[in-house]
Curated annotation (Swiss-Prot):
<feature type="site" description="Involved in RNA-binding">
    <location>
        <position position="92"/>
    </location>
</feature>
<dbReference type="GO" id="GO:0046782">
    <property type="term" value="P:regulation of viral transcription"/>
</dbReference>
<comment type="function">
    <text>Acts as a tetrameric transcription processivity factor that binds in a competitive manner to RNA and the phosphoprotein (P) to prevent premature termination during transcription. Transcription anti-terminator that enhances readthrough of intergenic junctions during viral transcription. Preferentially binds to poly(A)-rich sequences. Plays a role in the association of the matrix protein with the nucleocapsid, which initiates assembly and budding. Also, can activate host NF-kappa-B through association with host RELA.</text>
</comment>
<feature type="region of interest" description="Binding to the phosphoprotein">
    <location>
        <begin position="126"/>
        <end position="163"/>
    </location>
</feature>
<comment type="subunit">
    <text>Homotetramer. The homotetramer interacts with RNA. Interacts with the phosphoprotein (P); this interaction is required for protein M2-1 function, localization in host inclusion bodies. Formation of a complex host PP1/M2-1/P allows P to target host PP1 phosphatase to the M2-1 substrate. Interacts with the nucleoprotein (N). Interacts with the matrix protein (M); this interaction directs M localization to cytoplasmic inclusions comprising viral proteins L, N, P, and M2-1 and mediates M association with the nucleocapsid. Interacts with host RELA. Interacts with host PABPC1 (via C-terminus).</text>
</comment>
<dbReference type="GO" id="GO:0031564">
    <property type="term" value="P:transcription antitermination"/>
</dbReference>
<feature type="site" description="Involved in RNA-binding">
    <location>
        <position position="8"/>
    </location>
</feature>
<keyword id="KW-0694">RNA-binding</keyword>
<dbReference type="InterPro" id="IPR009452">
    <property type="entry name" value="Pneumovirus_M2-1"/>
</dbReference>
<feature type="site" description="Involved in RNA-binding">
    <location>
        <position position="23"/>
    </location>
</feature>
<dbReference type="GO" id="GO:0042025">
    <property type="term" value="C:host cell nucleus"/>
</dbReference>
<protein>
    <recommendedName>
        <fullName>Protein M2-1</fullName>
    </recommendedName>
</protein>
<keyword id="KW-0479">Metal-binding</keyword>
<feature type="site" description="Involved in RNA-binding">
    <location>
        <position position="151"/>
    </location>
</feature>
<keyword id="KW-0946">Virion</keyword>
<keyword id="KW-1035">Host cytoplasm</keyword>
<feature type="compositionally biased region" description="Basic and acidic residues">
    <location>
        <begin position="184"/>
        <end position="194"/>
    </location>
</feature>
């Protein structure tokens, strides 16, 4: 009985050729180095899927790519408003990435000022505290915040986005001269060129 060479697709995961594949899929026939390569590959795959610091969204679906068409066409706020209104076919992951970008633009000190102006028993205080906690979480690890937002049920996520957008609008109305993160970056680039 002749030993065939191990299937290179089977070593790196799974062979999709079925019966058409002329290489060996029987692990008992494989030499030890081929088994070690397969074992190492599978263990790395498991480790990668368990690692929360890796943004699997960007690898699988391109969710963290800069040239996403929805965000380019609608802007961050437009993507979030479209998701709330269930228009323009905005996916949950696109909304979560846009929400993370909006959280980076918000300043928790401004929200704390709004919170301090409310009455003690106002239900808005809880909303402000929730948004502040998301801002702090996003500042520490924005990829983990995207995962947390994605785990929320759709109705809860929409309510959270709506509350955050309302706070964002009230801050921009109260402080119209306040520059956003993107404006600050543009000013820094202009200063470098002069």
């Amino acid at each position: 009985m002749s030993r065939r060479n191990p299937c290179k697709f089977e070593i790196r995961g799974h062979c999709l050729n079925g019966k058409r594949c002329h290489f060996s899929h029987n692990y008992f026939e494989w030499p030890p180095h081929a088994l070690l390569v397969r074992q190492n590959f599978m263990l790395n795959r498991i480790l990668k899927s368990m690692d929360k610091s890796i943004d699997t969204l960007s690898e699988i679906s391109g969710a963290a790519e800069l040239d996403r068409t929805e965000e380019y066409a609608l802007g961050v706020v437009g993507v979030l408003e479209s998701y709330i209104g269930s228009i323009n076919n905005i996916t949950k992951q696109s909304a979560c990435v846009a929400m993370s970008k909006l959280l980076t633009e918000l300043n928790s000190d401004d929200i704390k000022k709004l919170r301090d102006n409310e009455e003690l028993n106002s239900p808005k205080i809880r909303v402000y505290n929730t948004v502040i906690s998301y801002i702090e979480s996003n500042r520490k690890n924005n990829k983990q915040t995207i995962h947390l937002l994605k785990r929320l049920p759709a109705d809860v996520l929409k309510k959270t986005i709506k509350n955050t957008l309302d706070i964002h609008k009230s801050i921009t109305i109260n402080n119209p001269k306040e520059s956003t993160v993107s404006d600050t970056n543009d000013h820094a680039k202009n200063n470098d060129t002069t």
